[in-house]
Structure formats: structure tokens, C-alpha cells
């Protein structure tokens, strides 16, 4: 039996086990997926433990950048952004990948995104994946909004290296008229209004955050304004299916829409 897991902290809630275990059952694969609460001080210990105990694992907040420094090898995309959300155990050799960017890229392309200006909220591991996805979809310019300006400047360095025209914008500053807004933070309900969505002329909003039984306030506000939305559940499902392919090889996977429908059906709002 294959055992896979998700590491993060504090990992208060996650839909990942429901997604992966549904796929395993649907495909009649002898495997299980479990959440594993791992604090930063125990991360190195977990990495060594996983070599014998797990066939692979996913990584979430706050470990995506740290894990990239601790495992044996990174594929080209993960190495470019130094952020890992999926680890494959290949005969005790831990190889890191990033499927977050795959999920973002797929969802943007499906909505007809063609590289228009973007506003990115956040500068952590998830934001690094967004920058890579935007570069692959032909994005020309992005602005980065983050509480820590230093981290935003660092992220812009990565973006510039990928050929994007990147600038940092302060909270309450000039956000411009971004075609797409992407939230790559666990933005709280008290903060979403800082964006003044109604004044930005945004056509598409992608929120990587999600809640188990309801939409985030950012998604709700965007819907009220008639803005097309991509929610965090869709991103979670798409990155999970990409991770399963890395772990299990090519298989006749269920569609993202099928899995999204299942997950939202068992977690009604």
C-alpha cells in the first residue's frame, strides 16, 4: 500500500485528503493520503522519517520554501522558483516539484487569459508559483502587493528574471487597472476590502485561499461585482491531480470538474 501525506502547520483544515482519497478509490489504487501536522522545528526530522514511511507528500504553508532547501533534488521548475509543494520518494531519494503553478496556469488558460497585466497579493511560496505560471502564459507586467515590502522586492527579482516587468505596490497605493488579481495569501475577511475591487476594472479574480464550507469573502465580493472568479478549491484540485500523476505515473485520471463537483458536494456551503 502506498501512503502519501500533506505537511503544514498549523494545518487547521484541509480538503486534500478528501481529494486524493477520492481519486485513489475511483481508480482502485491501493493508497491512502493523510494530513501530517509538522512544525518548522521538526521539519528536518520529518524529511528523514519520510524516506522510509511515505511514497511522497505534499507541502503547504509555511514549509514550501524550506522543503526546497532540505530535499535531495528539484526538477527544473521547482528549482527556478525555489518552492516545492510536491515531493516524490524515488527509492529514498526525495525529489521536489511544484504543481501549484500547473494549477494556476491551467485555470487561467481555461478562462481565456492572454497575458494581460496582473496584481499579485503575497510573496511567499505560493506567490512564487504564481509568478512562474504568469510567465508561462505570456504575462507582460505584474504588480506585487505584500505586507513585507522586502519579500515583495525579492519576488519581483524572480519575476524580472523570468522576463516579467514587475513592480512593488504598497497597501493603498496605485494598483493600476489589472486585468487579473491573484491572491496567494490566507487573506482574512477583514482585509479583502483593501483592494477596492469595484474601482480597479478587474475582469478575473483568482483566490488560492479557500474555506471548507463556504466561499472566501474575496470571492463573494468579486461575484457581487460581476467579476469572473477562480476559487481555491479549483486550484487545490488541479494541483492535486498533477501531484497524483507524479506519484503514480500516467493514469486515466478523473477530470478536474468531476473532482471539484464531488468535493463541493460533500462540503456544501
Swiss-Prot record:
Residues binding NADP(+), per UniProt: 76, 122-126, 208, 232
Keywords: Amino-acid biosynthesis, Aromatic amino acid biosynthesis, NADP, Oxidoreductase
Top-tier EC class: oxidoreductase
Pfam families found in the cross-reference section: Shikimate_DH, Shikimate_dh_N
Entry EC no(s): 1.1.1.25
Active-site positions on this chain: 64 (proton acceptor)
Ligand binding (shikimate): 14-16, 60, 85, 100, 210
Summary of subunit composition and partner proteins: Homodimer.
Sequence similarity: Belongs to the shikimate dehydrogenase family.
Protein name: Shikimate dehydrogenase (NADP(+))
Species of the source: Caldivirga maquilingensis (strain ATCC 700844 / DSM 13496 / JCM 10307 / IC-167)
Amino acid at each position: 500500500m502506498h501512503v502519501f501525506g500533506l505537511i503544514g502547520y498549523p494545518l487547521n483544515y484541509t480538503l486534500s485528503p478528501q481529494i486524493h482519497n477520492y481519486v485513489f478509490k475511483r481508480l482502485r489504487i491501493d493508497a491512502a493520503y493523510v494530513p501530517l501536522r509538522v512544525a518548522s522545528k521538526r521539519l528536518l526530522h520529518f524529511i528523514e522519517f519520510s524516506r522510509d514511511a511515505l511514497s511522497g507528500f505534499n507541502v503547504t504553508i509555511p514549509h514550501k520554501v524550506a522543503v526546497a532547501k532540505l530535499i535531495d533534488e528539484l526538477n527544473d521548475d521547482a528549482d527556478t522558483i525555489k518552492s516545492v509543494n510536491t515531493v516524490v520518494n524515488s527509492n529514498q531519494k526525495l525529489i521536489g516539484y511544484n504543481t501549484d503553478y500547473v494549477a494556476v496556469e491551467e485555470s487561467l488558460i481555461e478562462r481565456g487569459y492572454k497575458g494581460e497585466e496582473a496584481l499579485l497579493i503575497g510573496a511567499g511560496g505560493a506567490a512564487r508559483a504564481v509568478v512562474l505560471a504568469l510567465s508561462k502564459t505570456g504575462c507582460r507586467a505584474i504588480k506585487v502587493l505584500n505586507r513585507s515590502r522586502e519579500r515583495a522586492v525579492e519576488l519581483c527579482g524572480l519575476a524580472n528574471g523570468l522576463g516579467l516587468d514587475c513592480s512593488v505596490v504598497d497597501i493603498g497605493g496605485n494598483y493600476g487597472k489589472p486585468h487579473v488579481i491573484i491572491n496567494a495569501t490566507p487573506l482574512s475577511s477583514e482585509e479583502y476590502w483593501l483592494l477596492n475591487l469595484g474601482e480597479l476594472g478587474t475582469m478575473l479574480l483568482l483566490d488560492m485561499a479557500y474555506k471548507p464550507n463556504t466561499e472566501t469573502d474575496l470571492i463573494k465580493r468579486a461575484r457581487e461585482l460581476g467579476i469572473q472568479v477562480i476559487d481555491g478549491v479549483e486550484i487545490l484540485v488541479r494541483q492535486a491531480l498533477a501531484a497524483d500523476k507524479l506519484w503514480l505515473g500516467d493514469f486515466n485520471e478523473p477530470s478536474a470538474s468531476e473532482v471539484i463537483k464531488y468535493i463541493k458536494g460533500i462540503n456544501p456551503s
